[in-house]
């Protein structure tokens, strides 16, 4: 099955198929290839999640795509941006993608105080899940 076929599978088609261990093992190499692709191009995963919602109005700008790719490809990223660049939003989205694509990953965020950090992350997660409902289904 080609990547194009995997991406074009509608949620209705997926619901009709019972997922068994046999079925997963049969296509395991394809899933690994798809996950490796999304690790290099996390913005494409966001595009895929957005395509699942017919009423989607969210899209990434070029510089946001670039920032997400940098976050996923490099261990340490230092960036300075102007006001209203969506720094917190993109950072939290990057952390969420890292947790989705690297199960068991330990991630953290830093702010002036513990409560402030928790408040920022919580509000951004809520905002992301409102804009991209498929991301909410990834949270346990």
Question: Where are the predicted features?
Answer:
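Phosphate/NTP-binding elements of NTP-utilizing enzymes
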Residues: 2-140
């Amino acid at each position: 099955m080609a990547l194009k076929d995997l991406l074009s599978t509608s949620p209705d088609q997926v619901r009709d198929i019972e997922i068994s261990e046999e079925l997963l093992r049969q296509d395991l190499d394809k899933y690994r290839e798809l996950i490796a692709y999304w690790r290099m191009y996390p913005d494409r995963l966001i595009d895929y999640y957005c395509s699942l919602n017919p009423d989607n109005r969210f899209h990434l700008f070029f510089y946001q795509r670039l920032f997400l790719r940098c976050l996923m490809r490099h261990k340490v990223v230092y960036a300075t941006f102007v006001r209203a660049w969506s720094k917190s939003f993109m950072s939290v989205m990057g952390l969420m993608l890292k947790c989705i694509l690297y199960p068991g990953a330990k991630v953290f965020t830093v702010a002036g105080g513990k409560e402030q950090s928790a408040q920022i992350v919580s509000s951004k997660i809520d905002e992301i899940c409102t804009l991209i409902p498929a991301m909410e289904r990834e949270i346990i």
